[in-house]
Amino acid sequence: MGKDSFTPLYDGGDSSHVHLNKFGSNQLSQSKKSWIARNFSRRECIRFVPKSHDVSRCKCGRPRERHSQQALESGQGSEEWNVASCTTKHPTNAYGEIDFEGYGGQKRAPYLRMSHDTDANLVITLMLKRWNLEIPNLVISVTGGAKSFVLKPRLREMFRRGLIKAAKTTGAWIITGGTNTGVMKHVGEAVKEQQLMFGSDTQVNVIGIATWGIVDKQSDLISEKNGKYPALYSMEPTPGHQGAMLDPNHSHFFLVDDGTEGKYGVEIGMRSRIEEAIMKVKTDSRSEAGSIGVPVVLLVLEGGPNTVATMYELIKKKVPAVVIDGSGRAASVVGFAYNHTIKRNVDGQTINVIDPQYEDEVRAKVVEVFGAKGADKTYSMIKDVLEDEKMISVYSLDGEISQDIDLAILKALLKANRSSPVAQLNLALAWNRIDLAKSDIFTEEQQWTTETLSAAMLTALLDDKAEFAELFLQNGLSMREFLSLDILCKLYAEVPGNTTIKPLLQKEMGKRQVKTIDMDVVGEVIEELMGDMFESYYRKDGHYFGELASYAEGLVLKNRKSSKDLLANINRIDPLPTPYLDVFLWAVLCNRRELARVLWEAGREPMAAALMASRLLKRMASRAQEDNTITDISSDLYDHARLFEERAVGVLDECFNENETLSQTLLVRELDHYSRMTALELAVSAESQDFIAHTSCQVLLTRLWMGTMAMNTRWWKVLVCLYLPVLIFPIIYFVPDEQHERQAAEREHQKSLNQKSSKVKSHKEKNDAPVVPVYRSKEEKAVSNDEEARVGTENEEEDFQLEDYIPEIREDDSMEVIMRNKKLGFCDRIMHFYSAPFSKFVGNVVGYLAFIFLYAYVVLFNFPRFDPAKTLGGIHPTEIVLYFWVFTILIEEIRQLAAKPPKYIKDKVSVYFSDTWNFVDIFSLTVFIIAIILRFFTNSRIFTASRIILSLDIIFFIVRSLQIFSVNRLLGPKLVMIQKMMQDLAQFIIILAVFTIAYGIALHAVMFPSPGIYARNNTWVTITSVVQYPYWQMYGELFLDEIQGEKPKEFGEVDPDGRWLSPLLLAIYMVFTNILLLNLLIAIFNYTFERVQEDSDKVWKFQRYDLVQEYHSRPVFAPPLVLLGHILIFIRWVWRMCRCGHPPRGSTMKIGLSPAEMEQMDNWEFQAAEMYIHQQQQKNSGTLEERVRALGDRVDCINSQLNRVLDSMSGTRAHALTDGNGLEGGHDSEGRLARMEVELSSNSESLQKILALLQQQPPVKGQAAVPIQLTLLHYKARSSPYPGSTAKRFAVQDNMVDWQVPFPDYKPVNYTAPVVLANPVWADKDLMAMSPRPELPYNQMDHTCNVNRVSYNGTYVVKDGLPLNPMGRTGMQGRGLLGRFGPNHAADPVVTRWKRTSAGVMLQGGKKVLEFVAIQRKDNNQWAIPGGMVEPGQLVTQALKAEFGEEAMAKLNVSQEEKERIAKQIERLFQQGQEIYKGYVDDPRNTDNAWMETVAVNFHDDKGDLFGDITLQAGDDAAAVRWQRVSGNIPLYASHVSILEKVAKMRDAAF
């Protein structure tokens, strides 16, 4: 092979025009073209051996005239002819690209004529390196009939669709014989159809391997030099030629030459070797474990004896075969034989053999199809082919998988690897077929562990196969066991080069001069993207990414052979602390959307993770924008960041709806793995305006802003009390005061109830369940506090007692101090008032205004020149006060700089100056200090400079006061507008300067040419005039008289030529500046204004955070008294350093939680995230597109079944007409066909109506997709496995549910649970085991068992002594878990109230939000309405109260008096119930003979007072109980969602 053997010869991309550049004779070098000629050869006959029956033709198939004289002479006297001795090799003369004339839309197909003994590896090199084909994940070798044959229309359609689908979804190559006949033509037509439907961009690689000697029009392909580019190939066959045309729909051709002509089958051996060589090529994957040998599968369609021989040879090489039964000849014979095989044990091995009863029939078919000659050999090969059941699969059009022939092809390979589930998984991964993995690999029988899934998981991560990663996480893979430091580093080492993060990693590696990526490099890059406040734990956590990494590296160096095992053991002993977060960050940095989503959904702390992802993606998008070559990546990154921002807001919304208080705790808790930042800080860092604008954040900021003062405290009260502290007590209202008043009102209310209840005699109702409250500890309050309504009016606020949730309060954390509620003493009130950010703000505003007035007074009235002879240099005392005031402001700015979170001063400065106001502060203070220094010089000019600087500096101090307006909702956004317009103006000035300077220079050069009498000799005047006059002219001061030379004394003498040219230049200049540029500036300002105005509310809310954060951390006093606060801070710092060894944390907007509290909060947040994810999935599945797609799938299924029936009916009719009773049979068939047509017409009309209904009524946003056919068809009652068992129901399609529909093959599974068969008192006798069966009193009251057997749905049918489910078949007979045959009556009390927040009753979409008492079932952990079975002799009303008490209220040891009080309140509630539903329940426990029916009654606590002080506590029958929001997005047990929907409609509530 030449030195240029890896130089690409063919570009597999868009080739219809690219070949002109790449393969034209002018561009393609001679050396590249000759590579093929040097490495591939053809064969020519060198010995003419005449045929016995035709002496004019050689045994090679060519006539005498096509042989050389030497060949004619050497063949004289010879009778034997063979390829080895009678042919010789020559460089190939047929290669290039075929352009099929008349097929202009087709891409040109590369082709090559080669010898039959060519090295197969050389062919693979040609395809991969020269023709640039991608390594396939599968090779489908199609074989069969070489001559034209007819397929049934439906089989032809299935074959075409399935073959192309298999190739496209797996990235497969299809190999055929390449000619335009037989099975090859069917394959070509399938490809053509696919390209017509989806365009030529979706090309499938179809490789034709044909015999050169049978190809028609060989001369069109031959070129003695440099190949043909293109080779024009006409599809008109040559008259009289016995060969075949090449198929124009193939993409590549190999023409195998053994020197013969007209001989078929020459290519078989070469094709087999090529396929064998392909199997040794590894598939393309970033993971070594993900690279497998390319699998090959044989697809057999029709065919003759050679087809059977091909199957035989390939199956011996362990290539599985798929036979299309019903396609004719060989395929049908093999299919028939396969369907009549039995298993037999031979020499300890189980093999398939043809059933002896059918051997003669199979032999007869072989003779019938192939003829008697060679029948025994063919039969023997068929027997051998069928022996290994794993290696052969028969696809039947009428079989169970007839709808998906692609699955049959792929499952054949899985079947061949049945003994190795890991190999099967690798195949599914390579094909990216998640459907196969779910249905055939991850089954109940196969158990998976982290160890077996680790390699596949690494492949899924590296190859961005998110669905597989999700599947692995759901089926036994533990991320904690899987992820090690070694794998994490490998993930970052394999980051694709086209990502934004790759250059950043390489840059950091270059700085450190390292060749491999370690986590310290990654941590540095993450810190760079996150900003100076963030400190990655990859860098600071020395245990996991420092000491452990070094220890592991040392072990690897010492024990190279077992390094993987050592690292795995280390990972088991001491796993990484946050594996999900680690891999999630990698996926985000690689911008892998679906993978990031999967890992985010599975990980912890979803809100913080989403916000961090948003920040990282936005920063990477900003970096990408700086590179103009990757702007598309930038937009994609921004869109990805927006998705995570939406997810963070969604999780926060769920948390807030569930519990307002805990949601605010989530916002301010310290997160260890996020550099001890809070979710609020991460949101600000990510500039997430939507997140900060959320109600939860804004309520929290309001609470922090007001401190412990009531939220409605007016500013003037604060202003008065700042200077008259004694008025704090009468006019300032504090939050703890409200709490204590509310608690006092509760106690009074309880006292009055106790007094009334003491007059009532103790009594106990017969059937009432005990309902009593429970004493709550702080821990229990943490779960139930927000779920209990408070006694009072409808508009009262909920309790906000953070110490109930966060009991660990530390003195140095002012955040916790602010949010605590405790009784305030005299000093506490004063301290809390002055430490509130709002009070600090008012004090600072007043102080700053006083400072401005003092500054103005000094500058305007008392700023004398410094005189050393006078006392204090003659400086006025007010000026000294001003100096001291500025000094205190400077000290405060230094304190703010030192208090910034970053550790290093450089990072502190960076964070400090990220706030524009801080830059203004430092600039104005620096200028002030310069002015004061100059002020003390006695030189008059220096003093004047000092006075001027000081006078100008006041501008910046006054402008600084604009920050005061940021607290206002209307004026705050205006400041943002001004800031953004200043940025626009800076860019505009650059453009304006170009025009101004250009015009100024031209104008001056025209008016005052130099040198000469009109030249100006003053350089400074010349320079200033170049800028001065154009600038003022822009504002309307045109200087017309001056530029026209009418004022020579003032302006100077103007050159005569300039007098007429200057006005013309001015006119042009004014057009550009005043008309074009200034209007452009106005348009830019207008756009900025509209953009900010649209989100003005969000902008203001986002600004609030900075304001609250600044004043939350400020000392109590404003300058100049702030110095006292600094002294106190210093004293405290010294005290803590001496006592504890570390400085105080200072005043922060954070809450520190104990590990146990963090765990509880994490679990609660994770549950809220799961709810949000479920709602999003419901929303997506409820879209019109998804519903139409699902409906389309079902229509396809129905269509397939109907076609199958029609085919069967057609066959029956044809058979009947040829039978002796043809007339009668014909009439019967006609009648059935007529009925079928009627049914088809009816189905078509129904489908059209369904589609119209879907289009007219799209789903309401956020509304759940509640099954409309709940009353028509049962779904959960047909689900498998049956609850509490492994029993699976008989499959019943929707159209077969009705008992009226004939279903002769219906064989329901008989199942009754052992607990029911034990014959408890609540169960009937087992009628299924009795013969004859005794008749129970169905459809009436059973007085013997004291059970009502009347159905709420009316009379039900009784057959063979058993009742039939009125809703239809369920696939199971017996009773399952139900005790009674027939209806089993239940009672479901739906106890509701209005959901309240601190602002009153919650509203959604203008409607009130309901919440109901929900219990978590112990058997399946699903949430449900509390309810249960109606016991024998029990009334429904009694059952409602009893079930509510048993499942929602615990049996607690409280006083009898308290029991009576609670019982009375429950009695009041249950006296006002409204029936919601009465009838059948779609319950998974239902069977054909036993089913659930219920009565659902709504008991509504409208004012919220009945449950105000009653605690919900799960009983023995429930795992948990809580108040749950009524929403269609919440998954509930059985048909409870539809019941709640009825409640919401009745109450006109949101759903």
UniProtKB/Swiss-Prot annotation:
Alphabetically ordered keywords of this record: Calcium, Calcium channel, Calcium transport, Cell membrane, Coiled coil, Glycoprotein, Ion channel, Ion transport, Membrane, Metal-binding, Sodium, Sodium channel, Sodium transport, Transmembrane, Transmembrane helix, Transport
Motif range for Nudix box? Answer: 1428-1449
Any Pfam family matching the protein: TRPM2
Q: Which residues form a coiled coil?
A: 1184-1209
Extracellular compartment residues:
859-877, 938-947, 1002-1018, 1035-1059
Q: Describe its function.
A: Nonselective, voltage-independent cation channel that mediates Ca(2+) and to a lesser extent Na(+) influx, leading to increased cytoplasmic Ca(2+) levels. Functions as a ligand-gated ion channel. Binding of ADP-ribose causes a conformation change; the channel is primed but still requires Ca(2+) binding to trigger channel opening. May have ADP-ribose pyrophosphatase activity which reduces ADP-ribose levels induced by oxidative stress, thus preventing the channel activation by reactive oxygen species.
Q: What is this protein called?
A: Transient receptor potential cation channel subfamily M member-like 2
Organism equals: Nematostella vectensis (Starlet sea anemone)
